[in-house]
Amino acid sequence: MRFFFYGTLLDHDVAAVVLGRRLPPNAYVPASLPGHARRRAKGASYPVVIPDPRGEVPGVIVGGLSARDVEHLTVYEGPGYRIVPLRVRSHGKLETVTVFEPVVSRLQPSQDPWDLALWQRRHKRAFVQRLRRAFSGRPVYSRQ
């Protein structure tokens, strides 16, 4: 299965903890989600995407995900997101892939744009520590 990642899963360490394994660098194919904007979720450090006819959200397509991977991703994303097919642009072509789209009744966007590099500087360390604890009931990826 192929997914478009646009938020914290763009960080390879986060993806490794969630999936229980590190994906090879070539698993991440640059792509963008036209007709949307990426905002920080209200009261949170992670993003949501919202419709915006002038917007285009950068991200990656990750393919070759197993049913178990999708299960882990679904647990990670939680009830605030639903899995939907959306059209993304990659290498100049539009293609349909799977995206975790926010459920508006559960996650509200702030006015603040979300930036991966800023999130990594400000929030990543504590976020990954919490994530490792949350996923400690099953084997997680370790660099050791």
Model-identified regions with their sequence ranges:
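Glycine-aromatic micro-motifs
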Residues: 1-144
